[in-house]
Amino acid sequence: MRVMDIICPIGKGQRGLIVAPPRTGKTVLLQQIAKAVLTNHAEVHVIILLVDERPEEVTDFRMTLAKTGAEVVASSNDNPYARHIEVTEQTLDRAKRMAEQKKDVLILFDSLTRMTRAYNNQLTSRGRTMSGGIDSRAFQMPRAFFGAARALEEGGSLTIIGTALVDTGSRMDQIIFEEFKGTGNMELYLERELADRRIFPSFDMMRSGTRREELLFTADELKKIHLLRRALSGRKPVEAMEMLLDRLKLTPTNAAFLKSFGG
């Protein structure tokens, strides 16, 4: 998680999108985020929301996170679309109520793509059909879900980190991604070439980032991170990640790494 904390840190109230081609490690990444948050911020209530996932993936999440305190809520792909929608809306409603009670809540959900597909399949009458065969109305609830992330002025927060599936061969999946691209204040792109070479985390660092990161770093840390990005810019994702991982191994913490970087 050290790389993520540098490249695209997460703050309370964040709305983050993880852009994931197949087999790039998104499942493990979501599990690692949950574990890291619960280890370092025990006050946060973590909910893993799995929509239309394989039953074995749901079981893996529950077993992996069994002793962490994370709550796994799922509607696997052997359930009807109506069940996917019911679980999604119940989870969001409960998380919003908790945030209003001044609690900090994190929803990690997989995926925006399958959530939107579920709403598209449940529409009883057809509206305007977009390219890829998706009804424009299918985005209404997924947009509201993703947009619910915020830090409340009187205390409490709802952080939402969701995945969007790309490079699946489906035109509909690509349209769904394009609809949500740029709507978050954090985007993390996973890179297939890195995953194929078994280099993890498989982040495309130049395409990933957090908006208003100055709220999450000190002025000196931010300056060092900008220097780091400039040093890595122009390099291919594999080369950039290998270089960063090699440097991180030399220091025990990110604070120590940034202090040593750039003099």
List where the protein language model places each region.
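P-loop NTP-binding catalytic core
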Residues: 1-18, 24
